[in-house]
């Protein structure tokens, strides 16, 4: 991967793609430097995802698909049948999905792309037809993510206005980064905050620093300042005190994977926020596209939790700086935790807000109704 010094009109555009070319904003260097890395194929894409150049469940899925799209676009000579092309693509996708195991969006995207590849191979007479079908499907994912995020924002803002008492002066707390830098654009939880701000009813957004990789202080604060949204950065450990002081009306977070019962895996520290919100009678929402929901998992106990390098805690700047902890100390560094569904008031999606019937979510029924209505 090579650094790109080209200027980009929108410094918050994490994914810059045109057919045959992909550049990813190196989020490890934000907010002090804006550096784009050239991605030439699936191997570059895998390392960019694994090394946190790009992060955020939706962005990871799109970056993976487009990294392979770039490789396919620049294949000079491919000798083989349509079945050979399908085998080539499927092997690359299997490799890409190993880069980050917790985010369901990546595995969901791979499954969908494999379906496109299979259908194309069954009817195509040549390899290029299979490659073309894959390219179009990967590029569609980029466009669809932005549209889904804007819908999440609108549904979330509308729901908050109708369900929170003082809905004309909302203060919202969020965690990690769920904005343009974590998606193809606009964002999920941060997209809701953007929509609330656009409606003129946001008093203040609060963002946690989100240790140890500091996605909140480095990325979310950067986006909020960029958009001139009234915002305050807090230490992770200050969240409960902020709620106790009566300065939070709602907590909204993103999701890397949502189980069928509503249990949600998200950035480490989310569970603590949900517990504090419950204690202080503050509604806690998850904002995520339907692609983040994994109906194959009955509960959060089945979600695989990725563990990150000890260096993220032993060294400053999320492992990129100098050593700050004593040599020889043991480290436990899970990247995510699971928030039980009983702590979640609603799940904001691009098809509406999933609320509980009684004390439980019926996510499967919601998705069935939402997708069947859109197809009529």
UniProtKB/Swiss-Prot annotation:
Location relative to the cell: Cytoplasm; Nucleus
Gene3D superfamilies noted in UniProt: translation initiation factor eif-2b, domain 1, Translation initiation factor eif-2b, domain 2
Main location per the UniProt record: cytoplasm
Annotated positions for site Transition state stabilizer: 176
Keywords: Amino-acid biosynthesis, Cytoplasm, Isomerase, Methionine biosynthesis, Nucleus
MF-aspect GO terms: S-methyl-5-thioribose-1-phosphate isomerase activity
EC number: 5.3.1.23
SUPFAM superfamilies for this protein: NagB/RpiA/CoA transferase-like
Claim: Metal-binding is one of the keywords in the record: no
Family recorded in the similarity comment: Belongs to the eIF-2B alpha/beta/delta subunits family. MtnA subfamily.
Protein name, as recorded: Methylthioribose-1-phosphate isomerase
UniProt source species: Vitis vinifera
């Amino acid at each position: 991967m090579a650094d790109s010094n080209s200027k980009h009109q929108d410094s918050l555009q994490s994914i810059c793609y045109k057919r045959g070319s992909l550049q990813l904003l190196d989020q490890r260097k934000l907010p002090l430097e804006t550096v784009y890395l050239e991605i030439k194929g699936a191997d570059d894409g895998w390392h960019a995802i694994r090394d946190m150049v790009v992060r955020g469940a939706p962005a990871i899925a799109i970056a993976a698909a487009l990294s392979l799209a770039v490789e396919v676009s620049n294949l000079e000579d491919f000798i083989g049948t349509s079945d050979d092309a399908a085998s080539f693509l499927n092997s690359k996708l299997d490799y890409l999905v190993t880069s980050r195991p917790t985010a369901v969006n990546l595995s969901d995207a791979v499954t969908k792309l494999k379906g496109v590849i299979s259908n194309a191979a069954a009817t195509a007479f040549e390899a290029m037809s299979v490659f073309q079908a894959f390219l179009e499907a990967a590029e569609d994912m980029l466009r669809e993510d932005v549209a889904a995020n804007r819908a999440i924002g609108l549904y979330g803002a509308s729901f908050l206005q109708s369900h929170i008492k003082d809905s004309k002066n909302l203060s919202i707390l969020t965690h990690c980064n769920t904005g343009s830098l974590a998606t193809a654009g606009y964002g999920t939880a941060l997209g809701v905050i953007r929509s609330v701000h656009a409606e003129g009813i946001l008093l203040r957004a609060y963002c946690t620093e989100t240790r140890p990789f500091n996605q909140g202080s480095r990325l979310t604060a950067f986006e909020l300042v960029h958009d001139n949204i009234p915002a305050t950065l807090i230490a992770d450990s200050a969240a409960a005190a902020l709620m106790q002081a009566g300065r939070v009306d709602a907590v909204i977070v993103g999701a890397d994977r949502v189980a069928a019962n509503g249990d949600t895996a998200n950035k480490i520290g989310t569970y603590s926020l949900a517990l504090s919100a419950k204690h202080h009678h503050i509604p806690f929402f998850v904002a995520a596209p339907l692609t983040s929901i994994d109906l194959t998992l009955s509960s959060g106990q089945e979600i695989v939790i990725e563990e990150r390098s000890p260096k993220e805690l032993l060294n400053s700047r999320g492992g990129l700086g100098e050593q700050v902890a004593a040599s020889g100390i043991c480290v436990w560094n899970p990247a995510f935790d699971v928030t039980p569904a009983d702590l979640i008031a609603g799940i904001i999606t691009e098809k509406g807000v999933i609320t509980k019937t009684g004390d439980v979510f019926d996510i499967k029924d919601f998705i069935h109704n939402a997708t069947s209505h859109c197809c009529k």
